[in-house]
């Protein structure tokens, strides 16, 4: 993976490889992840992407699939409910060998979590330095070099919340479907619209396509439904606003490890249904995102 700065004289009017024309990460070619089904989870910061990703990963594993979850946020907290700890990141372990990846062992950066889900935290450079996209690229490269992706059925990328260049876009190079986690409120739907726009732009260069919305912390979905109908989106699942979900995070556990109750069993069933639906395959969506003013006018009550 390399970076490139393109001077104005080099910029033509035709199509350019992704990353050209600005200071961005140019993605490697031929970086497809084996035969695994790959999902990238997006959404507004704090919306519950890591909770959603971890429970979805366990749901896939309950279906008998071999699952790998890759946390792509410098906070490196994507997998702690699976591993019960904050595991070392790829950047952490690369630093210990002076960035000589050939000296790393699999057990240095891949950790087994709940029900056999394999977990990796890409980590990231310190705030204001480096490129998150480079870190994700190095993580996938390491996994391929150690042949870990050859024995994986499902890969789940849990992506940082902000729409930025490298860190946001890197998982899209590898993903088959991008899923957006949102709640039934203005701020998270507004962010979802921006993410739809960004993914649509990246889909011109990658094979990734929108898969749909996962409604999280949502007892109702009236605003999400308005948004979906307007842009041609669909909802794949609805996770209600349950206190047991908050408690599961505090217990460093997934919902599949919580004491059984009617509401726990219901939300487990929702995740299992979602995993099965995604495994069976969802048709790609080609949505038309709204302008900021239009979404402002669309949402809310008269």
UniProtKB/Swiss-Prot annotation:
HAMAP family named in the record: ChlL_BchL
TM annotation in the entry: none
Enzyme Commission number, as recorded: 1.3.7.7
Descriptive protein name: Light-independent protochlorophyllide reductase iron-sulfur ATP-binding protein
Keyword Acetylation appears in the UniProt entry: no
Compositionally biased region (Polar residues): 1-10
Organism: Rubrivivax gelatinosus (strain NBRC 100245 / IL144)
Pathway(s) where this gene product acts: Porphyrin-containing compound metabolism; bacteriochlorophyll biosynthesis (light-independent)
Pfam families documented for this protein: Fer4_NifH (PF00142)
UniProt GO MF annotations: 4 iron, 4 sulfur cluster binding; ATP binding; metal ion binding; oxidoreductase activity, acting on iron-sulfur proteins as donors; oxidoreductase activity, acting on the CH-CH group of donors, iron-sulfur protein as acceptor
Residues noted as binding ATP in the record, renumbered to the chain: 46-51, 75, 216-217, 240-242
GO terms of biological process kind: light-independent bacteriochlorophyll biosynthetic process; photosynthesis, dark reaction
Cofactors required: [4Fe-4S] cluster
Cofactor annotation remark: Binds 1 [4Fe-4S] cluster per dimer.
Keyword list, A-Z: 4Fe-4S, ATP-binding, Bacteriochlorophyll biosynthesis, Chlorophyll biosynthesis, Iron, Iron-sulfur, Magnesium, Metal-binding, Nucleotide-binding, Oxidoreductase, Photosynthesis
Reaction(s) the record says it catalyses: chlorophyllide a + oxidized 2[4Fe-4S]-[ferredoxin] + 2 ADP + 2 phosphate = protochlorophyllide a + reduced 2[4Fe-4S]-[ferredoxin] + 2 ATP + 2 H2O
